[in-house]
Amino acid sequence: MARYNESVCRLCRRENLKMYLKGDRCYTDKCAIERRPYPPGQHGQGRVKFSEYGVQLREKQKVKRMYGLLEAGFRHAYQNAAAAKGKTGENLLQTLELRLDNVVFRLGFADTRNEARQLVRHGHFKVNGRKVNIPSYLCRAGDKVELRDRSRKVVRISEALEAVDRRGVPGWLELDKGGFKGTVRTQPSREDITMPIQEQLIVELYSK
């Protein structure tokens, strides 16, 4: 499966948005978008004016990169959101937030979503007492996400948890830092998702 293997800092610069793809570095003055707030490339300092379609496409690409998904996975999430009751755009964001890799990231067990995805794939977490190694697994309100006993000595996880106070944990989640576990208190509302996302643009793009 294809993956983006270049510097993730270029992605933030391309979208002109700090997407916190680099973990701790994003909170320092070493952050690439702080030092070079223009797109990468030879002609990056002159931003292009996009068409309506271009604006919609850029918004989709931004959200895909933010959550670390390829087109197939993102489209699948959109199709599920479109089939559910309620507003498709809000359903999409809720679906993305409830992915297990994102919940692990939001709880502070990993510095980035990419790192959280790797930890889930390597079987470090249990959901409601059972090992789950599928990053796209959708959590529900009341689910308990817990680090497995054998994984509690993993240095990167411990380091990430030490920095959780700086990043914060969203209100729809509850972290028991000492117990290496967290709870999905409720489904995230639109107000819980604070990143600047215009989900209606994505709906318009896929509706064409």
From Swiss-Prot:
Pfam families for this protein: Ribosomal_S4, S4
Top-rank taxon, per record: Bacteria
Keyword line: Ribonucleoprotein, Ribosomal protein, RNA-binding, rRNA-binding
CDD domains documented for this protein: S4
One GO location term (cellular component): small ribosomal subunit
Keyword Nucleotide-binding: no
Regions crossing the membrane: none
S4 RNA-binding domain sequence ranges: 98-161
Coiled coil: none
Keyword ATP-binding found: no
Gene Ontology molecular-function annotations: rRNA binding; structural constituent of ribosome
SMART domains in alphabetical order: Ribosomal_S4, S4
InterPro entries named in the record: Ribosomal_uS4, Ribosomal_uS4_bac-type, Ribosomal_uS4_CS, Ribosomal_uS4_N, S4_RNA-bd, S4_RNA-bd_sf
Entry's Gene Ontology BP terms: ribosomal small subunit biogenesis; translation
Family annotation (HAMAP family): Ribosomal_uS4_B
Subunit structure: Part of the 30S ribosomal subunit. Contacts protein S5. The interaction surface between S4 and S5 is involved in control of translational fidelity.
Family: Belongs to the universal ribosomal protein uS4 family.
Protein name: Small ribosomal subunit protein uS4
Source organism per UniProt: Anaeromyxobacter sp. (strain Fw109-5)
